[in-house]
């Protein structure tokens, strides 16, 4: 949704805004860098404004921030217990960042940073590395019990352990791909339909009549994309809470 180029993939192109290179290393400031900073700034400003003047009868902004707080807190408590609340700052930051980034990308000419696999994979790796680091810090070598389910017959225990290890280290892949693929597919679909409408209108009166149905579809898909933007942030947060439970309670 970031341009009117005929190619629906063009909107995901990474472009340099400020060229910076040191030796053979490229440190250029890109459109992705800009929208990452914009997402952080907008999230921070919204949370600051909504929480700076708290009222007994909450404003709309205060209600939204309190709902986000309660959602993350309750999800974390249900998944990892009271001990899991120490991860609240991380989980809340991830939820707000992904949600705001997804919503920003729905506006014309704005870039969707969550449609870049490098961004979503970085967020997923942050979660998994936190699980591993905190798990070993809290339990030491006992964290490895995560890969040895209790009650499994000795004969098949090695096989089950291998499956558990593969499953654990595939988490960042599935977590990142889910968010990346949904945002990418949705924006490509919108671009295709909007491009079709422009092409139909260019045909004249008959084309205008034929563009009504695609226009209705585009509006419906746009509304659906707002829902998907929230759901993907929701799913990422829920799965993050479930994974962080392994750092607190590694035993099956």
UniProtKB/Swiss-Prot annotation:
Key component of the proton channel; it plays a direct role in the translocation of protons across the membrane. It is a multi-pass membrane protein. PANTHER family: ATP SYNTHASE SUBUNIT A. One of its GO terms (molecular function) is proton-transporting ATP synthase activity, rotational mechanism. InterPro entries: ATP_synth_F0_asu, ATP_synth_F0_asu_AS, ATP_synth_F0_asu_bact/mt, F0_ATP_A_sf. Belongs to the ATPase A chain family. F-type ATPases have 2 components, CF(1) - the catalytic core - and CF(0) - the membrane proton channel. CF(1) has five subunits: alpha(3), beta(3), gamma(1), delta(1), epsilon(1). CF(0) has three main subunits: a(1), b(2) and c(9-12). The alpha and beta chains form an alternating ring which encloses part of the gamma chain. CF(1) is attached to CF(0) by a central stalk formed by the gamma and epsilon chains, while a peripheral stalk is formed by the delta and b chains. GO terms for cellular component: plasma membrane; proton-transporting ATP synthase complex. This is ATP synthase subunit a. Keywords: ATP synthesis, Cell inner membrane, Cell membrane, CF(0), Hydrogen ion transport, Ion transport, Membrane, Transmembrane, Transmembrane helix, Transport. The chain crosses the membrane at residues 29-49, 87-107, 117-137, 146-166, 196-216, 219-239. It is found in: Cell inner membrane.
């Amino acid at each position: 949704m970031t341009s009117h180029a005929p190619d629906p993939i063009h909107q995901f192109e990474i472009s340099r805004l400020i060229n910076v290179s040191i030796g053979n290393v490229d440190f250029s400031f890109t459109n992705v860098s800009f929208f990452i900073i914009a997402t952080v700034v907008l999230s921070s400003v919204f949370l600051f404004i909504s929480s700076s003047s708290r009222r007994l009868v909450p404003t709309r902004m205060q209600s939204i921030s309190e709902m986000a707080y309660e959602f993350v807190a309750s999800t974390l408590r249900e998944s990892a217990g009271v001990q899991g609340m120490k991860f609240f700052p991380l989980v809340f930051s991830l939820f707000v960042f992904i949600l705001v980034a997804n919503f920003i990308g729905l506006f014309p000419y704005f870039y969707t940073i969550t449609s870049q696999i490098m961004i979503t994979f970085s967020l997923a790796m942050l979660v998994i590395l936190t699980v591993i680091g905190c798990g070993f810090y809290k339990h030491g070598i006992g964290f490895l019990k995560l890969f040895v389910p209790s009650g499994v017959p000795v004969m098949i225990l090695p096989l089950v352990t291998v499956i558990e290890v593969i499953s654990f280290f595939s988490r960042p892949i599935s977590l990142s791909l889910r968010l990346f693929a949904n945002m990418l597919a949705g924006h490509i679909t919108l671009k295709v339909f909007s491009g079709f409408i422009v092409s139909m209108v260019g045909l004249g009166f008959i084309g205008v009549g034929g563009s009504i149905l695609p226009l209705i579809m585009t509006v419906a898909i746009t509304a659906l994309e707002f829902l998907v933007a929230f759901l993907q942030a929701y799913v990422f947060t829920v799965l993050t809470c479930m994974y962080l439970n392994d750092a607190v309670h590694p035993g099956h």
